[in-house]
């Protein structure tokens, strides 16, 4: 990796331990699929980046440029399956996600950012976790374990009052990699910590476990708190009327 400069531009972002072997062998995701009518979404082209040149230059590590690349990656591969116009775009995104995560890791490895800079340190951990989640969605070996590791480090580094929101995001990650029991536990902790928004993903995770009554309880509580979010009403209607199925979706090996 190209040496990182000592000047760092502002960095903006925003279960029990599962080892890499388990993540690598378990290429399935448990999904609760709601049979709701939805419009077909076509992927927009993924931009072309030279990640290293965009992020590293004489002034140091360009956090704004890194954020822009990560946002474009999230637009296309923030959920599984990824959305790309063609395989070439997908391959470039895979390379970009790995490269950008490596550059962020370099900030820690070279001690350019340390725990003595708590906000920047947490920002870097969060960026690596998110990029590794994206890389996992792109079927990069080892990415899920790396995301898990950095979410755990991030939670430990956060003040107690800030952990509920991050538990919600981490719970979403756990659900996405098929760790449904761990996801429910993490999302429950998020709700108990005051994150009412976590009730929606918690309801969906409970539905994945076949716990319809508990799922509806969380979905209804969410809908009451956030009546403007139409998703909750649609999910509740689908669950109540049996327009959903729980299935295992195989992630293709590459």
Question: Where do the PLM segments sit?
Answer:
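Alpha-helical adaptor scaffolds
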Residues: 126-201
């Amino acid at each position: 990796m190209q040496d990182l400069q000592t000047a760092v531009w502002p960095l903006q972002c925003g279960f029990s331990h599962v080892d890499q072997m388990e993540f690598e062998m378990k290429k399935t995701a448990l999904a609760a699929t709601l049979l709701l009518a939805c419009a077909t979404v076509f992927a927009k082209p993924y931009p072309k980046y030279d990640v290293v040149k965009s992020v590293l230059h004489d002034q140091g590590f360009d956090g704004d440029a890194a954020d822009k690349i990560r946002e474009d990656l999230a637009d296309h591969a923030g959920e599984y399956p990824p959305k790309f116009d063609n395989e070439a775009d997908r391959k470039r995104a895979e390379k970009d996600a790995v490269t950008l995560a490596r550059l962020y890791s370099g900030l820690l490895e070279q001690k350019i950012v340390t725990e003595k800079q708590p906000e920047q340190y947490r920002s870097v951990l969060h960026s690596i976790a998110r990029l590794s989640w994206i890389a996992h969605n792109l079927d990069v070996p080892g990415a899920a374990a790396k995301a898990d590791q950095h979410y755990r480090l991030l939670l430990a580094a956060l003040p107690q009052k800030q952990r509920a929101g991050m538990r919600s995001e981490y719970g979403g990650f756990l659900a996405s990699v098929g760790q449904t029991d761990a996801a429910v536990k993490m999302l429950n902790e998020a709700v108990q910590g005051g994150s009412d928004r976590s009730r929606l993903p918690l309801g969906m995770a409970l539905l994945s476990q076949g716990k319809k009554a508990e799922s509806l309880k969380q979905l209804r509580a969410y809908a009451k708190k956030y009546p403007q979010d139409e998703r909750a009403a649609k999910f509740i209607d689908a669950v109540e009327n049996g327009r959903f199925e729980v299935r295992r979706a195989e992630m293709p090996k590459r």
